[in-house]
């Protein structure tokens, strides 16, 4: 399926080397402030063009908002955003037509669709398609700003190098002023060295990120299959390359006694609140007013220059593949922006489901 969400719904489309990728966002109330600059800002955060090995394609992200927005405000109708694919070199992929790349979706798509799929640049399974999710996230973040919710993230691991410094939310915000959004300067230096090493080896590296949501009102989420973390886990695994997901203190809780794992409950400003937040802002999958946070990990980019064993599907015999096209030495920084975006989409959906914002009422501009 290419559609996600219940009240705030997104439908993405497009392939890596097609004319464009894009998204249709439905469920946005009328009167919400939304500009092209909002979308441009999020798309540019994803690019990392100042580090060419992280984004050798580095497209300028030419996009258009085709519908649903007029004079800087939403119309309450579907918002269609198209992002044109410009820097496409499909010749690299001619020899890959019948040689599926190990670790990529090529083999799975061949087994499911036969020859009826676009393999160039990874096609529908490419990280390029996350540009559409980031555009949808720009709309979702506009919805969340209206209710005081902020979504932000940072890199916590890259190429086996993990951050070790303690940090605050403000440190996470400031990390985006660095070459990579990493709060720990010593770890950042080692991560850059790992990137250089991978480039010299003709290889790639994976890593992990952490995403926070601040100002989330209590009461979002529903029992069992409507839990916030269930929806966010599904959303996270929809981002290409995600291999693991951890909510709150995650695995560390499994090593504690219950008395250590539980967050004490106290009173803040006359309301019950968590004294600590090992639970990641959720109890029973429902928000309690504390910050939400989770971590996700990405495998190394499957496309590498080192020779790899595969199969020639035309001859049905083993062969060796040496990839000659452009590839990202790591997708982690760009994928972080996509994870922020899909987190915003999930939370915007739950804000609408809870009735905090009504789809059938304009946010502003009403004459009655």
UniProtKB/Swiss-Prot annotation:
Q: Which SUPFAM superfamilies match?
A: Chorismate synthase, AroC
Q: Which organism is it from?
A: Pyrobaculum calidifontis (strain DSM 21063 / JCM 11548 / VA1)
Can you tell which superkingdom this protein's organism belongs to? Archaea
Q: Where does NADP(+) bind?
A: 46
- Listed HAMAP family: Chorismate_synth
Gene that produces this protein = aroC
Its protein name is Chorismate synthase
| Functional note | This reaction introduces a second double bond into the aromatic ring system.
List, alphabetically, the NCBIfam families matched: aroC, PRK05382.1
- One GO biological process term: chorismate biosynthetic process
Q: Which GO terms describe its cellular component?
A: cytosol
Q: How is the cofactor bound?
A: Reduced FMN (FMNH(2)).
- Give UniProt keywords alphabetically: Amino-acid biosynthesis, Aromatic amino acid biosynthesis, FAD, Flavoprotein, FMN, Lyase, NADP
GO molecular-function term, one example from the UniProt record: chorismate synthase activity
**Can you tell me which residues bind FMN?**
124-126, 284, 299-303, 326
Tell me its EC number(s), please: 4.2.3.5
